[in-house]
Amino acid sequence: VNHFHERVRAGDDPAAVLTGLAPISRDNARTPVHWDGSEKAGFTTGEPWIALAPDHGTVHAAAQAGVPGSVFEHYRSLIALRHDDDALALGTFRLLAADHPTAWVILRQWRSPEPDETGENRVEQLLLIAQCARDDLTLTGEGGLLAALAAEGLQAGQWTEAEQVLRAGDPDVQPGSGHAGLPAVLAGWDSVLLRRRA
């Protein structure tokens, strides 16, 4: 908006400025949120400034609410976890495998300020591994991602029996669901959030 006004004040044709901005506008990669299947997708009763996606009648939040494994429910779980988990909300952040071409690996660690019933300050770690490509990602064994992370101080053996907190590719994995263990392979576009307490 600022660039547009600056160019018009400088004497440029408004239509030409808009034409020049169109290929680089962030609006090319987004549409209004589709809340429901109504004519304006529940986004507005007026006219949105950019067009709705053609599938807004079938792909929307209301169609995914309550459906295990849906993007809506996965985000709902992530938001709840952010509110309920001290390591996620308050813990230190460490990016691992920063040069990996397809994986995001994040370690969060939090130490409770108050001793527990044993007199120790509880330490909780969360490890997120997300495969951001369609190919499978090998995690364990020789040549697996965790073996490569040993150089960054991550001990793979500590995570083999960790609790699986959330798994994008498996809606049955939820906090407290009892799923444990590091998967050997993450499928394309899958992620796993693991928790261990020390």
Regions found by a protein language model. Give the residues of each.
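Loop/helix patches that line or flank the sugar-binding groove of alpha-linked glycan CAZymes
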Residues: 1-125, 132-139, 153
